[in-house]
Amino acid sequence: MATWMEGKYVARGQFTGECIAVLTSGGDAQGMNAAVRAVVRMGIYCGCRVFFIREGYQGLVDGGQNIQEASWADVSGILQLGGTKIGSARCMDFRERYGRLKAAENLVKNQITNLVVIGGDGSLTGANLFRAEWSSLLEELVTSNKISAESAKQFHRLNIVGLVGSIDNDFCGTDMTIGADSALHRIIEATDAISTTAHSHQRCFILEVMGRHCGYLALVASMACEADWVFIPEMPPTDDWREKLCHKLRMNREHGQRVNIIMVAEGAIDRACKPITCEIVKNLIVSELQLDTRITVLGHVQRGGSPSAFDRILGSRMGAEAVLALMDADRDPNLPSCVISLDGNQAVRVPLVKCVDRTRQVAEAMKACDFDHAVELRGTSFMNNLATYIKLSKIEQPRQSVMSSENNLRIGIVNVGAPACGINAVIRGFTRLGITKGYKVIGIHEGFSGLVKGDASEIQWADVRGWVGMGGSMLGTRRDTPNGLGIDKVAAKFKELKLSGLLIIGGFEAYECMIELVEGREKYPELCIPMAMVPATISNNVPGTDFSLGCDTALNEITSVLDKIKQSALGTKRRVFVVETMGGYCGYLATMSALAGGADAAYIFEEPFTIDDLREDVVHLRAKIDDNVKRGLVLRADMLINTITSEFIHQLYAQEGQGIFDCRCNVLGHMQQGDRPSPFDRSLGTKFASKAIDWLDEQINANIVQILQSIHQTFMLYINWYCTSSDNLFKYSLELREHTDFVHRLPKEEWWLSLRPLMRIMAKHDSLYESESIMAGTDRK
């Protein structure tokens, strides 16, 4: 299970009298508004005065009306908006000392010594320099009679915390920057749309994506849309790339592919550090292959639109932690300025100086054409993505004679449980990598019930073309388990199909199937083959993993609907919505969508509540709407106490809110499973497939004799991966049983429960918040 460091509890009004300012600088990024909102509301919750600095560093230099005190209501209704409410600008004045001198004067005059800077590497580098010069700036201001000596003494220390807001994801020290996930959404939305017209005309499309000198967006987008080729700065192609590119496109066309997609990062270069542009690639393809080729430059579309659920939650978490980091620094002068970063799934504080220095080293390595070192400096998350892409880019459809050889070992793949977006990405990646390794991949249709009926067939290379972007399960899925169907029948089919390994994709039912198959090995030797499982369920209730495939897509679907529901209340005003989400007994979807959607409450099984709690929330909403807030939003997970249904909550709110607000109820239902997978689910599914086939191949090769002779042997059985940035780790299924609540189909420990107080605080409730961040080094990325 995930291990979390304990932080400090923070109560309302704990830091009364402190002043905090927040600014957004440089290029805007979706999710900045979520961070600004969290800084303001957590600051006010802690008793601080919070100030907006409008127009970034330019507003800090100009002062005056650009520095304004913020209220709770000032950040209401901005969570779902792209860009930044307080404006951003690239400020040349701040690059010079005279500009920083004016900025220091304006901060002192407003009695501000705590600053949250939200921006990219340039903005945070400027913040680092500003803090380093603070003492000398104050001395100069005293000498020129701009401030008094008493003021200089009173405000002698400047505390700065950075939040990385950048779609490029190019800042060292954090796995994800605010805005990168939303930018991926825009890229994939555009690519999916382009693919349909490209298919009609058999065209090749070359897409230029942003990212400056970082290839993250192009790299992940290429995996998420089955691109034929990608050009990124960190991995310049070999000198013969023209021949290889043309060969790959030619082969794909010969095998029936009607569409070719090529991703080009705007900073793409060759081994001689010369730019590779879309025009160069287009001219090559047209001259050598005579393909109808078009260029699409996505441009600032990637910065726009509503933030993804991930960026809203990330911005909220980082903004809240930034306030607490500032308060800690104010009480301990030895603490360095830090950046609130994401390490795997945990917020950490990384020294700002080290982050800036490491980011500078990346630029130097790229300039020196030391690409391997640049990739290493980018961090483990980037390296894992790159390794997966390289593995997939090297494979091509084998000759038919190799694919049809009778000597090929057979690996089965089956789906169990409800459909979830991302499943098809696993099947595609697993199938093609398996075929390349010499296996026959046997697709078992309609779960284990299909297996018992003999509904299984070999999956061919071309069968899975285009599957990464498809929702649901193309193989079909059922909830039946081996014991329910008769494990003797399942074992007989294993023997009949001559399976040497098995991959199960699914949710809690798949987890139960794995355990039943392990327990059946003692009686049925046919089950003694390596098996692995990929967690895939929107409920995110599989023990041993932080994220299951499909839950990110579901979160985005729910968040999008919540935005529309809240929008409807703007016209009617004074309305509270009760919304029921899926998830079974697991409250993940209800809690995280409440945080991403700005809900006032979320009722879940894991956190018991009573009628009195409901009444308190009604009182809270009455006061909120009396205070000129137009709407309220309450979420409920679908499996709670039987008597407290969504309709009961709706009637209670409607009755208690009479004269103040009216109430409506919405049950979202199966639309939460989504249409097309999110970029996260597509890329995660592809990486899961790569890890699964590698492990199964290793186990099969290590035990090849025993498998062929059907010797009774219990191989080590792994269940799934705890998804971190540093690696994808396997877990033993039987070890996980003690961490499982089988009655309610839940893990006994759930990491996201620690975020519930933050959700309540953002909605103006009293709640005891626990800081989740710890101090860490840049080597975590």
From Swiss-Prot:
Mg(2+) binds at D121. Residues 395-409 are annotated as: Interdomain linker. It is found in: Cytoplasm. Its EC number is 2.7.1.11. Catalyzes the phosphorylation of D-fructose 6-phosphate to fructose 1,6-bisphosphate by ATP, the first committing step of glycolysis. Residues 1-394 are annotated as: N-terminal catalytic PFK domain 1. Homotetramer. Optimum pH is 7.5-9.0. GO terms for cellular component: 6-phosphofructokinase complex. This is ATP-dependent 6-phosphofructokinase. It catalyses: beta-D-fructose 6-phosphate + ATP = beta-D-fructose 1,6-bisphosphate + ADP + H(+). GO terms for biological process: canonical glycolysis; fructose 1,6-bisphosphate metabolic process; fructose 6-phosphate metabolic process. It is an enzyme of class 2 (transferase). Keywords: Allosteric enzyme, ATP-binding, Cytoplasm, Glycolysis, Kinase, Magnesium, Metal-binding, Nucleotide-binding, Transferase. Its main location: cytoplasm. It comes from Schistosoma mansoni (Blood fluke). HAMAP family: Phosphofructokinase_I_E.
